[in-house]
Swiss-Prot record:
It comes from Rickettsia prowazekii (strain Madrid E). Belongs to the ABC transporter superfamily. Its main location: membrane. ATP binds at residues 371-378. It is found in: Cell inner membrane. The keyword ATP-binding applies. This is Putative export ATP-binding/permease protein RP696.
Length: 576
């Protein structure tokens, strides 16, 4: 068990001192009640039953009933407050992990699987709640009862108590031996469970593709393979746990049997009374159950501590922070410039996606971007948004190097519409105002009309307040793209980035919407990656990108006459 991890967890406990004091008082009350019952049993037998003293018997029974009431009330407070503290702490940890995750650099998500993130924020954190309850409730209670029962056993019989003490090292040996193996298995089990969650997430996000290719049977087989892998780790871990539990039970009950045998001899010889041996056996049972509980908890601590370790790695991971950030100049005349920019994705280190790229875009320009697949078009936009950092060269907005500007400040100037419209499982309106939650109803209604959302939203039962399902499953591709564009326009950006943002619309609808966008964005910059050449024919100029660089630029007319690459791209689209 990693003490550093437990110390880290203990830091959260300081916020709940009052609750923990109640838990500790309740724990001590429970332990004291159970231990006191042993001495009452001795009096019940030696002073009551042995002497036929019914008054003493009644008094002992009354005391036992009183202790049971105290035990019950204390158990309620212990259970309620420790579980309440555990839930508060895990929610605090979950919030910290979520807050840190959502502020990671975009490139850091390339190393993470969505299923693994979900698993860590749900299953792993639930394991931490188990760790808190087990340690602060059961472990401490059992420890107090073990120490108390052993102490009281020495008062009853030093010889018999010494026999009980000998059994503790016997139980420690297998615990230490199996501990490291169980920890490794626990880590593998959690990783395997994350793969299961990833598979479930991937399956139901792509359910239409699975249906279209009749791949249900194959997916079930793949899922079963992952499930069996997870079960193998669980089975092995549970087998070791069961073996240790069996050894513990055998040692505990053999010890109690030995105590009864030796104790019976002492009674016959007059060294112990019947009440003392009953009281001693009671304490021995408590000691056995408590030690068994402690050892079982210790054997099971590896799973939640491994989960805690996985969560701590998320909380402690820090993104690259530049200490010399400056505010971005908020001038009316906006400009963008790339100077000899190079970029390579970490996942593809041998492929230079952007290669010595240079370009300049000034205010009041509608700029089209064309190029074959993999030429670097979308990467250009993502560098501008500071999703990634260029390796070499400089990217300027308003003549400022964006490497020295907070990414959040840069994105205040920009609205981005990807080809795959990102829609949240809420209402149409909530998806639109995601771009600007301070927009007035008038502004929202105007944007809805301009983007053509009004045409289909009025046919829905609740209009723009209609719930559209997870990822907008109840909408068509074109409808989702209109919502994504409305969200971007409501933001009132200085720079609008369209990455094949109208690919699901027909040519006529696309032109109508594009004309509306140009009116709204007058005086600012529109950069549009073309799905169809027709969508950028009216652009002020077009950048032709090939192999990560700008090879030529000009109007549609000029490029059609003078650029072989551009003509080939146009020709390829006509043949599709």
């Amino acid at each position: 068990m990693d003490i550093k991890l437990l110390y880290r967890l203990a830091k959260y406990l300081r916020f709940y001192k009052k609750d923990l004091i109640i838990v500790m008082i309740s724990l001590l009350s429970v332990s004291a009640s159970l231990l006191l019952i042993g001495s009452i049993f001795r009096d019940l037998i030696d002073r009551g039953l042995a002497e036929d003293n019914i008054l003493s018997v009644n008094k002992s029974i009354l005391y036992i009933c009183l202790l049971i009431v105290i035990l019950s009330v204390a158990s309620f407070f212990r259970s309620y407050f420790i579980n309440n503290v555990a839930e508060k702490i895990v929610n605090q940890i979950r919030k910290e992990a979520y807050s840190n995750l959502i502020n990671y650099e975009i490139e850091e998500y390339e190393e993470l699987k969505i299923g693994d993130i979900i698993s860590r924020l749900t299953n792993d954190i639930d394991q931490i709640a188990t760790l808190i309850v087990n340690f602060l409730s059961f472990f401490i209670r059992n420890s107090v009862m073990l120490i108390g029962s052993i102490t009281l056993m020495f008062f009853e019989s030093f010889k018999l108590a010494s026999i009980v003490i000998i059994t503790i090292p016997i139980l420690l040996v297998p615990l230490i031996k199996f501990g490291k193996h169980v920890k490794a298995l626990s880590k593998k089990a959690l990783e395997s469970k994350s793969l299961l969650v990833s598979d479930i997430d991937e399956t139901f996000n792509n359910i239409r593709v699975i249906y279209a290719f009749n791949h249900q049977i194959n997916k079930i087989a793949d899922f079963d393979t992952k499930l069996q892998s997870y079960l193998i780790y669980c089975k092995t871990r549970l087998k070791i746990r069961a073996l240790f539990f069996a050894i513990s039970i055998a040692v505990i009950f053999l010890t109690i049997t030995l105590i009864v045998w030796i104790g019976a001899s002492d009674i016959v010889q007059g060294d112990l009374s019947a009440g003392q041996i009953i009281s001693f056996i009671y304490y021995a049972i408590i000691a056995g159950v408590s030690s068994g509980g402690i050892f079982e908890l210790l054997s099971e601590m590896h799973l939640p501590t491994t989960a805690l370790e996985r969560i701590i790695t998320i909380i402690d991971k820090t993104s690259i922070v530049h200490n010399n950030y400056y505010a971005l100049n908020n001038s009316d005349a906006i400009s963008i410039e790339f100077k000899n920019v190079d970029f390579t994705y970490n996942s593809r280190p041998n492929l230079k996606v952007i290669n010595n790229m240079s370009l300049k875009i000034n205010s009041n320009k509608f700029v089209g971007i064309v190029g074959r697949s993999g030429a670097g078009k979308s990467t250009l936009i993502q560098l501008l948004l500071r999703f990634y950092r260029q390796e070499n060269g400089t990217i300027l907005i308003n003549n400022q190097d964006i490497s020295f500007v907070k990414p959040t400040d840069i994105r205040k100037f920009i609205a981005y519409v990807p080809q795959e419209a990102s829609i949240f499982s809420d209402t149409i309106k909530s998806n639109i105002i995601f771009g600007n939650n301070k927009a007035s109803d008038y502004e929202i209604n105007e944007i809805i009309k301009i983007t053509g959302i009004e045409e289909f939203s009025t046919k829905l039962h609740d209009g723009i307040n209609t719930k559209i399902g997870e990822k907008g499953v109840r909408l068509s591709g074109g409808q989702k793209q209109r919502i994504a564009i409305a969200r971007a326009l409501l933001r009132k950006p200085k720079i609008l980035l369209l990455d094949e943002a109208m690919s699901a619309l027909d040519t006529m609808s696309e032109q109508k919407l594009l004309n509306a966008i140009k009116k709204i964005m007058k005086g600012n910059i529109i950069i549009s990656i073309a799905h169809r050449i027709s969508s950028i024919e009216s652009a002020d100029y077009i950048l032709v990108i090939d192999k990560g660089g700008v090879v030529t630029e000009g109007s549609h007319y000029d490029l059609s006459k003078n650029s072989e690459i551009y003509r080939n791209i146009c020709r390829e689209q006509l043949t599709i």
